[in-house]
Amino acid sequence: MSSIIVAMLLCAGLSSPLVIRQSCHVQVAAHTFYGFPDNDPPGCVIAYDCGRGLTAGGAGTFNDPLTFASAPGEFQICEVIYDPYLRKYLRMEDSCDSCNRDWANKVWHIDIWTGSSTVSGGNDQVNCENRLTPAPQHKPIIRGPGPNLLVDATPLYVTSVCNAGSVFSSYDAQSFC
């Protein structure tokens, strides 16, 4: 059935699939972070091409969302969400083993990309990822966000610099919808 709809859209002159935005709502998800040194395998390669090839990255804006990983079926591939804790837009572009284990128990989990797509920050970067991980880990995210939410484009990690101060623990998640 879906292939018939796609064929009808292509015949109607639409060269790319329609993206139907879901309604905005709040979802609580565990937050963890990953990057070049602890990606599996180490490096910047991601599972899904959502417009930048198979390379993790992004600034966190609506037009350049930061990569996040999750379990298959938890989010739509290439789905864009907004994270008030980071004040960044994120796009589901990768998979995550710990997310898979959590999702098997119906626990929502996002693993957010940090750092460079070309250089490993080694243990310094992994330590930064641990500092960025909130306690408690479960924070609200916004699914189906509008394009004009407040963004902090400060990189989470740049060689030897952990921007753990660029997180925002106090907010009313519902106000973002």
PLM-predicted stretches and their roles:
Residues M1-P17:
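Cleavable N-terminal signal peptides of Sec/SRP-targeted secreted and luminal proteins
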Residues G13, P17-C177:
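Secreted/periplasmic proteins
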